[in-house]
A protein has these predicted regions:
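Beta-strand-turn-beta hairpins that frame and shape the catalytic cleft
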Residues: 37-48, 161-171, 204, 249-256, ...
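Conserved catalytic scaffold of divalent metal-dependent phosphoesterases
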Residues: 34-40, 53-58, 102, 122, ...
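N-terminal active-site segment of His-dependent metallophosphoesterases
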Residues: 1-117, 192-201, 206
Length: 273
């Protein structure tokens, strides 16, 4: 899969509360960009790709009660689809690249917690949801996570590749780090999982921690870059480290779409006249 175009100006944006760098919370805006890709499954009109939804917002469908940003966005984006401003939600697949939690007051940076409600909110509206856990995501206890992963339309990946109507999506969750900490694994273990996933030739690879782009300020992992950069037909989706420019192409042809704190709607390109 190749991204052909990607708008620089958001078509929609939503205010939300996020933890401020020096304490407390701040109001920031969550943007939605639109782009096109060369190919999608016949029954899929678009992919909606998001990551790092670490905030809260009033939920209009719950009398303004504060909810996780991802829960609010799932409803708002579905409404836009029903209104005809975006593709119908039943024709849109959702890709989540992790870190979907926030404390209720949005005043703790790097808070960890249960994100099943966000996944379920997208699954209720959209065609299917696929993705990985970030280093701040939990899914209940071990048995609860197993039950969650058995829910129809939900595909939480970690070293697997799933075929979704002909689109092969692989994923590896978490980040490289101290394996004694939640959401982290040692470099050797992470790269072993990554290489095993790549051997199954996914069209889209979902990571929470993505590659860097050498010689730029686009931050990420050099060792992940070395693993993914020679795959010309691969689209890597990631978050974790925010890029001012969301799309980059590595020297070997691999495209990297960074959706930290943003959403990107990728629609099938219209045939040339």
């Amino acid at each position: 899969m190749r991204i052909l175009t990607l708008d620089e100006v958001p078509c929609h944006s939503w205010p939300y509360q996020s933890a401020a760098p020096r304490g407390g919370s701040q109001t920031v805006w969550f943007p939605l960009l639109r782009g096109t890709v060369d190919v999608l499954p016949d029954e899929v009109a678009a992919l909606l790709v998001l990551s790092d939804l670490q905030g809260v917002a009033p939920h209009a469908l719950q009398d303004g009660a504060v909810a996780l940003l991802g829960e609010v966005l799932a409803d708002e984006l579905a409404i836009l689809g029903e209104l005809g401003e975006l593709p119908l939600p039943g024709t849109v697949g959702v890709v989540l690249a992790g870190d979907l939690y926030s404390e209720a007051n949005a005043n703790v940076r790097g808070a960890s917690g249960d994100v099943r409600a966000v996944w379920q909110a997208f699954a209720e509206h959209f065609r299917w949801v696929v993705g990985v856990a970030g280093n701040h995501d939990t899914f209940g206890g071990a048995r609860e996570q197993v039950r969650f992963q058995q829910r129809p339309g939900i595909h939480l990946l970690d070293g697997e590749v799933v075929d979704l109507e002909g689109l092969r999506v692989g994923g590896v969750g978490g980040i490289i780090g101290n394996p004694d900490k939640a959401g982290r694994r040692g470099e050797t273990d992470f790269l072993r999982q990554l290489d095993a996933t790549l051997r199954e030739t996914p069209d889209v690879l979902v990571l929470h921690q993505g590659p860097d782009v050498e010689g730029t300020r686009l931050r990420g992992s050099p060792v992940i870059r070395e693993s993914v950069q020679r795959r010309a037909n691969l689209l890597v989706v990631c978050g974790h480290a925010h890029w001012e420019t969301p799309l980059a192409t590595l020297p070997g042809g691999t495209q990297v779409l960074n959706v930290d704190s943003r959403a990107v709607l990728l629609e099938r390109a219209k045939p040339s006249a």
